[in-house]
Amino acid sequence: MRLLNILVLVPLLALLTAPPVCAQVTFGSSGAEGDPFRRQQWRVPSPDTDTAAHALLFRPPGAGPFRLAVIAHASTQNGLRRAQMPQPEYRALTAFLIARGFAVLVPERLGHGATGGRYVEDQGGCDEADYVRSGRATADEISLALEDLRKQDFIRKDAAIVIGHSAGGWGALALANADPKAISAIIAFAPGRGGHANDESNRICAPHTLLAAAAEFGKAARIPVTWLVAANDSYFAPAFSIALAEAFRRSGGKVDFRALPAVGSEGHWMIESEAGVKAASADIARVLNLPKPMATKKP
């Protein structure tokens, strides 16, 4: 009887310990185009080959090929907040870019919202914060999404731009070592990691480590960076942001730092609002170096 029980348990144990059979991950469009701006759900590669990152793609009218703008969203070390994060859209910024002939991709990175999966860009606690590793992890995710879209016939193979916000901007700084023919410019809105340490305004987790990481990114930088921060940013205030930008520049990075007027009650989120995009519009337009925008419907 004992032998019979063993014979029954062996295949059962094998089933319980076998690796799961995963459905094949597919990339590309996952829904119809809609409003505004031909809004469409897409799936793009992530560092986890079993997980596709959810993304939104917006396009101007016509067949293209269009220059591509990839918007890299902010993040948080709080796992619950990440899990509850809605799909980022950056509507006002997207409208600004669409009006100037860009296709716009907004991917949601691993460990956030509907994409889910493991949070690969975790920086660690204040005592052991690794801002270089976390920034490079974010850069890898941005790069995977960008390269996947560049395979599409309606996207140009050159002159893409990356616009990063907060942690997304930090990843964009790490991506400044990419081919400048593929990515012509980076715009970073209040880039950084570790802001609002313990949810306290104007407190940064391991600021000296963050400064050293900015210098590390600057060493290999090849793409010019426009660094924008609002006067009332309580995550990375202008004084500290200037120090970060200088660390990046002194080690070899090319950076144009601009302090913008206060926007709303918290300037760190300026780029998510129409007022913030308006405040930054001249600087963004200068980076894009484009003629006057085409007429588009308001989102």
Q: Where does each model-flagged region fall?
A:
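Short substrate-entry loop that stabilizes the transition state in hydrolases
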Residues: 64-66, 75-114, 237
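The conserved beta1-alpha1 loop
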Residues: 72-74, 229
